[in-house]
Amino acid sequence: MTEEMQYEYLVPLEKYLSAGVRLGTRLSNKYLEDRGFIFAVRPDGLRIFDIKKIDERLKIAAKFIARYRPERVLVHTTRPYGFKPVQMFCKFVGCKALTGRFIPGTLTNPNLPHYQEVDLLFVVDPKLDAQAVAEAAKMGIPVIALVDTDTPHQYIDFMIPCNNKGRKSLALIFWILARQVLRERGELKPDQDLPVPPEEFETKLVQS
């Protein structure tokens, strides 16, 4: 039996594939390539992430997040498809959700009414959430981020390579992380799932 067959994924491999979690962009990213995160390049130029690497990073990220008091963890996204996944993750884990525009000074100016004092920042896309990442770096706050092949890696302390743009991908990623954080805390048994499926974390399309 090969090592790949023995490896136990957090969810069945088919779930990762159907959610498009491994799909990157057509942009090259030497930083991610050098670290073995990119598995292949399709004929059309689309980068494909190594699902096992994604799974491994999710396990580590869950352990990392579980070490912090949830009320001191801020999860931020300006990407609309990330709003529902972030809100659901924070609902189950107890973290603070900040969706939409990040007001300058949120992490750096205690005189502002919207100031947030946090110990860990988690962002969906460092490119779109650059203001939050920059303020966290200035304040010495560690940053976890979902990174695609078009994502800058500066100031990111721990990256989870994945498709950080798709509705289904973001829903599955945050569902897995919520479940794993609760398992790490002992609030769920090692084989216990969340009471809702990943689809409940998914942003619904509005019919016109």
Curated annotation (Swiss-Prot):
GO biological processes: ribosomal small subunit assembly; translation
Molecular function (Gene Ontology), one example: structural constituent of ribosome
Record Gene3D superfamilies: Glucose-6-phosphate isomerase like protein, domain 1
Keywords carried by this UniProt record: Ribonucleoprotein, Ribosomal protein
InterPro entries: Ribosomal_uS2 (IPR001865), Ribosomal_uS2_arc (IPR023454), Ribosomal_uS2_euk/arc (IPR005707), Ribosomal_uS2_flav_dom_sf (IPR023591)
Pfam family, one: Ribosomal_S2
Gene Ontology CC terms, in alphabetical order: cytosolic small ribosomal subunit
CDD domains, A to Z: RPS2 (cd01425)
Annotated segments matching region Disordered: 189-208
Family matches, as HAMAP family: Ribosomal_uS2_A
Family the UniProt entry places it in: Belongs to the universal ribosomal protein uS2 family.
Name of the protein in its database record: Small ribosomal subunit protein uS2
